[in-house]
């Protein structure tokens, strides 16, 4: 007899199969909604464990960040190289209301722009928007040949690079400080800032492939439900009650 073995314990039946539970029965689906800044607001679906006890499904979803291709949000393949990050801020039934959380370029697009015989110029600024979002914005540009140029390359001097970087930083700061986060997002989609940088730097050195390649959210203000609803086109920042009409007081004769 082995030490510590209890003969009274009943043994399980040999060959008995273990009960298999489908993990998806404990989960539920939610629809992700993009802000009204984008043309296609239906981003997709996400999974989360069902609410049990003190654990709420909405608490697990708030703060979740999803990455979406801008081509899917705008319905155009011209934006296929840009990725948009959306953060879940509010849960309404089965819908998740999101806000802009950042932007980035795909790796293949960045590598395809880097070529020989040209100078790469990068600049970044940390700015606060008019609605108190602190963003770090990265811009990228490449030099190109001047008109009637004979030389094979289009290298810029250090003085040109410093001057161009200063102009880019000033334009980015001006555009961000005078815009809300939603307004800035609408400027990034058609690349309005890029055209402004190209016109401002053409007297210093001609540029090409100018892009705001990355936007990083560093700090956000206190959460405001009204502002989020206005961003999704589901209400204004102010909620006002309506006067009730057609109501008559009824007098109870007996209690």
From Swiss-Prot:
Cellular location(s): Cytoplasm
Modification comment: N-terminally acetylated by acetyltransferase NatA.
Region (Disordered): 1-20
Site of covalent link Glycyl lysine isopeptide (Lys-Gly) (interchain with G-Cter in ubiquitin): 248
Residues with PTM N-acetylalanine: 2
GO molecular function: structural constituent of ribosome
Known function: Component of the ribosome, a large ribonucleoprotein complex responsible for the synthesis of proteins in the cell. The small ribosomal subunit (SSU) binds messenger RNAs (mRNAs) and translates the encoded message by selecting cognate aminoacyl-transfer RNA (tRNA) molecules. The large subunit (LSU) contains the ribosomal catalytic site termed the peptidyl transferase center (PTC), which catalyzes the formation of peptide bonds, thereby polymerizing the amino acids delivered by tRNAs into a polypeptide chain.
SUBUNIT field: Component of the small ribosomal subunit (SSU). Mature yeast ribosomes consist of a small (40S) and a large (60S) subunit. The 40S small subunit contains 1 molecule of ribosomal RNA (18S rRNA) and 33 different proteins (encoded by 57 genes). The large 60S subunit contains 3 rRNA molecules (25S, 5.8S and 5S rRNA) and 46 different proteins (encoded by 81 genes). eS1 interacts directly with uS11 and eS26, which form part of the mRNA exit tunnel.
Protein name as catalogued: Small ribosomal subunit protein eS1A
Organism (species): Saccharomyces cerevisiae (strain ATCC 204508 / S288c) (Baker's yeast)
Gene it is expressed from: RPS1A
């Amino acid at each position: 007899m082995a030490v510590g073995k209890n003969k009274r314990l009943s043994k399980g039946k040999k060959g008995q199969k273990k009960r298999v539970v489908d993990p998806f029965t404990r989960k539920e689906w939610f629809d992700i909604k993009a802000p009204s800044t984008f043309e296609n607001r239906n981003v997709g679906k996400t999974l989360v464990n069902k609410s049990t006890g003190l654990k709420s499904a909405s608490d697990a979803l708030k703060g979740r960040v999803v990455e979406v291709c801008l081509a899917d949000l705008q319905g155009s393949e011209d934006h296929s190289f840009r990725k948009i990050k959306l953060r879940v801020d509010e849960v309404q039934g089965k819908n998740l209301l999101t806000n802009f959380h950042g932007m980035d370029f795909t790796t293949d697009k960045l590598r395809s722009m880097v070529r020989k015989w040209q100078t790469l110029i990068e600049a970044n600024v940390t700015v606060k928007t008019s609605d108190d979002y602190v963003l770090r914005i990265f811009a990228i540009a490449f030099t190109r040949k001047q008109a009637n140029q004979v030389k094979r390359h289009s290298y810029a001097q250090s003085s040109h690079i410093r001057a161009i970087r200063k102009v880019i930083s000033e334009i980015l700061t001006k555009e961000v400080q005078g815009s809300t986060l939603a307004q800035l997002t609408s400027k990034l989609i058609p690349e309005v800032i890029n055209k402004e940088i190209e016109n401002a730097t053409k007297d210093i050195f001609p540029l090409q492939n100018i892009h705001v390649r990355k936007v990083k959210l560093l700090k956000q203000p206190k959460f405001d439900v009204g502002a989020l609803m206005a961003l999704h086109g589901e209400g204004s920042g102010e909620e006002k009650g309506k006067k009730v009409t057609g109501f008559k007081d009824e007098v109870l004769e007996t209690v």
